[in-house]
Amino acid sequence: MPQPPNFFQRIRYSIFPGTLRTEKVREGYRRLFNSLLLHFRPRSVPEDTLRWTLTWGLGGMAVVLVFLLLGTGVLLKFVYQPIPEKAYESILHLQRDVLFGRLIRNIHHWSANALIIVAFLHLLRVFFTGAFHTPRQFNWVIGSSLFLVVLFSNFTGYLLPWDQLAFWAITICTGGLEYIPGIGLWLQKLIQGGPEVGPATLSNFYAIHTAILPAFLLILMPFHFWRIRKAGGLVIPRGPEQSSGDRGPSVPAIPDLLLREIVVALVLLASVLVFSMLFNAPLGDKANPGLSPNPTKAPWYFMGIQEMLLHFHPIFALFVIPLLMLIALLALPYINYERSEERRVGKECTG
């Protein structure tokens, strides 16, 4: 005979009317949850994919850093004020008066820089293992787009402290937009919110940094993982005597794969924490539009473009060359590569 609902069950039933969940219903929910997980992780994985040297854990590291940035970013929003008169002072207040405020800012800053490096190395790893060929071409485009989102997330966040270094670095970068043919001046004014870097620029960058770009990340990342799953998982390099379809013995994803991912995540989090305790995020003097530092430098991840300005006309350094590089990056998996047996064996051996 079924037991009558207890006090707490009656409260829940009053809020969510309907039949209380039976064991059969709960089993259905468990199956649904497991089905959703299978979109990103299979029940079993080839044992060879667990080798540390195959991926170096770079994809998982990138995911951990993204969520670490989202978490610390939400905490920073409670203190930061995106107006020129208070932005710099709010950072000082965060570092001096808020409990663990300096540490949280340090973690956010160094995680953002680490994410660029990790994402770039992940892109290189995919390239050198040939993991961008059929049926993974479009996933290469998605991954490249994610890397661009990471770059622009760092770029938009660079201005927010409103110190001299950030202000003039952004002034240099946005000033170069005017050399883009046709839409350069319009694009520059759109991003700056006016003819020069000022309060509207800070407001625009804050909105892009805290709302638009995180939304792109949260949409593209699951899609990226789902495409990996649909393509059959990781590419396993094979020797000349092995069939490319031979994936070897399999092991359960839980716990074999899950434990390795947890270990990588914990080591990464510990490393970021220790680094953030030892090294503070930079903060210069308050931004002064009338006093330009010498030399004025772009953020380190855009210094290559700034260096090209010394050797090429701005149109080529800021528009033509970067555009050609971007087109080449996105078109890379769609090139009709030679598929001879010798080429295939060579690629698999070097992969």
What do these predicted regions represent?
Residues 33-45, 70, 114-128, 325-334:
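Central hydrophobic cores of alpha-helical transmembrane segments in multi-pass inner-membrane proteins
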Residues 22-23, 37-57, 128, 195-201, ...:
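Cytosolic juxtamembrane amphipathic/interface segments immediately preceding
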Residues 204-212, 219-283, 340-342:
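Long, contiguous internal "core" modules enriched in hydrophobic/ aromatic residues
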Residues 13-31, 77-83, 110-133, 138-141, ...:
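Transmembrane-helix bundle segments that line or gate the permeation/cavity pathway
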Residues 342-349:
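Conserved small/polar residues in nucleotide/adenosyl-binding loops
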Residues 156-160, 221-233, 266-297, 318-337:
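Specific lipid-exposed transmembrane alpha-helices and their immediate membrane-water interface residues
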Residues 90-95, 169-170, 174-185, 232-253, ...:
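Juxtamembrane inter-helical linkers in multi-pass membrane proteins
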Residues 29, 50-68, 95-117, 134-138, ...:
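Membrane-entry segments of alpha-helical transmembrane domains in multi-pass membrane proteins
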